[in-house]
Amino acid sequence: MILVIAEKPNVARKIAGALSERRPIRKTIFGVPYYEVFRDGKKLIVASAVGHLYGLAPKQDFFGYPIFDIEWVPVYIAEKNKDYAKDYIKALSVLAKRVKEFIVACDYDTEGEVIGYTALKYACGVDPSRAKRMKFSALTKRDLLNAWRNLEPTINFGMANAGIARHVLDWYWGVNLSRALTHAIKRASGKWVVLSTGRVQGPTLKFLVEREREIQSFVPKPYWVIKLVIEKNGQKLVANYEKDKIWSEEEAKKIVTEVKKSKARVSNIEVKRQKRNPPVPFDLGTLQREAYSAFGFSPKKTLDIAQSLYEKGFTSYPRTESQKLPKNLNFRLIIQNISRMPQYRPYAHLLLGMPELKPVEGKKEDPAHPAIYPTGEIPGPGDLSKDEEKLYDMIVRRFLALFMEPAVRESVKVTILAGPHKFMLSGARTVKQGWLSVYGKYIKFDEVTLPEFFIGERVRVLQVRREKKKTKPPARYSPAAVIKKMEDLGIGTKATRAQILETLYQRGYIEGKKSIKVTPLGMKVIETLEKYVPEIISVELTREFERKMDLIMQGKLTKEEVIEEAKVKLTKILEEFKKRELEIGLELARIVVGDVKDEIKEEKPIVVGKCPKCGGDLIVKYNKKTGKRFVGCSNWPKCDVTYPILQRGEIIPTNKTCCNGAPVVIIRDKGRDIEICLDIKCKKW
């Protein structure tokens, strides 16, 4: 028997339906569905994960920093509200014992490879190298059967290792830096306020803050524009002065005076026709930008909808950077199927009449997946939500446009001379629809048709007007523009960028759905980190590690090398942070707490009792290397008395002693009080 592991339950159902030579048998174990199917004389069990079944967590339970000693644990232990994953882990564990072979059929990307790798290693208890790999970009029967017939001999260890490295680095950065910020505020104010930053989150917030500063520091400058209002065949037209901005009011007045004294005539007419090729196939970033422009969808919403369309089998895998379609894709069959939908029939029939179907393609490639395309599976009534219908329509129309003829646009520029001054009258129109006939609803072209002019023609001037304007600050980023900026900077991935933006909203660092404004909290976090530990928010450092994770994928670096380098780098950053922890905490606490005094005071140590050896104070200390807390004598290094202590909970002195004079303390954690002697040899332990 063979166990096929899908990423999600609905995908497992699709795979079972595609591979089964007869109707799949649906069964459940621990309430989790799985399928028994027969293919090529073999019995298959098709089961699923439910996204990530395993996450990273510290091996020891303490809230200090830095912490690098982490391990993979079930996701319901690593994260809150993930109890639903428990039964899926149990199901895979039991089913794995029934089979001899394994096939990973998760999404073919770094996250899918990590899901498959960890499910095999920890839930199934087998060496991941034993598993074969189904590789597909669409959940149609033909794609899944093709993946079955062309199984990869192993999972893609390059992608798996790169994905594991990314998870570890994100954990190192996110958890350690967030703990550092939280500890800093606690030290300065005595209050627990959780702040977060991350490996990509920080640099992203930084460029948003930089734009906010540009806007805040912007000083508008006055300028003047001059317009010439003319009449032609009863139609009023407005021509613009050859200089788009005049910085002197006196100069503007002079021009107006001179124009009023002059006769106006047409001095030149320039007509150009330009072919506009169809837009290239959708990669995820372009789809997110177009959907934002057309529907106002956030990048996260677009990705979620595109993922749903993929899982329903109507479009291909969305997390791609490719602008190229598969060479073996049956374009004619897909278009024939699309022609069954009335809204696309005229365009599909036009294409089906062509002897050859050759799509326009872009330059970008993705080794894992092609550009996004409709699979040819046709949605039935009620299959799609309203938002899914919108995005599906955009994807289908874009696909059809790829095969159509270029559009032709005509631009006309009429130059009007009034004395020594030139004014420009511009018009533009579409003279051949081409691909615009199918995709024009998502492309905004100005259509301005001018009446016919002749060179030397006298022009009737109705008005010459001078308008005062002011320069405007740079525009704030839209959500779609943030994704584009992250792409340009080389930070984040196609799969993570939208979620990083959502995290910044959730943390209260930014606000505004269409025009993103950084909040005072977001401004203060970046201002403080820039001042004391600028490397935390370095775009260059983040981009460098992104490049190294690509090298892991290519097999040119090992994950261990990159993880160790990251650990060394982050340790240095955190050492610098600890030196300035109180100052950082004071700056941040003023905005998140509000009642912190300006003077810097050293935090009073917690005294738990007297040293039985020298009579000094026994105080709570922190190991500079590990961040772990312990109890030690205030007279160190003259006195070397130390005691270990639990790493979680509030420490409350009791003024009592126990074994050999060791103090007794109360550890208060999650509403529970535990009274303990600090001597680990005490029988009460």
Swiss-Prot record:
Region Interaction with DNA: start-end pairs: 196-201
ZnF (C4-type) intervals: 611-639, 658-682
Top-rank taxon, per record: Archaea
Gene Ontology biological process terms, A to Z: DNA recombination; DNA repair; DNA topological change
Domain named Toprim: residues: 1-141
Molecular function in Gene Ontology: DNA binding; DNA topoisomerase type I (single strand cut, ATP-independent) activity; zinc ion binding
Keyword Transmembrane: no
Active site location: Y317 (o-(5'-phospho-dna)-tyrosine intermediate)
Pfam families named among the record's database cross-references: Topoisom_bac, Toprim, Zn_ribbon_Top1
HAMAP family: Topoisom_1_prok
Description of how the protein assembles with itself and partners: Monomer.
Family the UniProt entry places it in: Belongs to the type IA topoisomerase family.
Role played: Releases the supercoiling and torsional tension of DNA, which is introduced during the DNA replication and transcription, by transiently cleaving and rejoining one strand of the DNA duplex. Introduces a single-strand break via transesterification at a target site in duplex DNA. The scissile phosphodiester is attacked by the catalytic tyrosine of the enzyme, resulting in the formation of a DNA-(5'-phosphotyrosyl)-enzyme intermediate and the expulsion of a 3'-OH DNA strand. The free DNA strand then undergoes passage around the unbroken strand, thus removing DNA supercoils.
Name of protein: DNA topoisomerase 1
Organism: Pyrococcus abyssi (strain GE5 / Orsay)
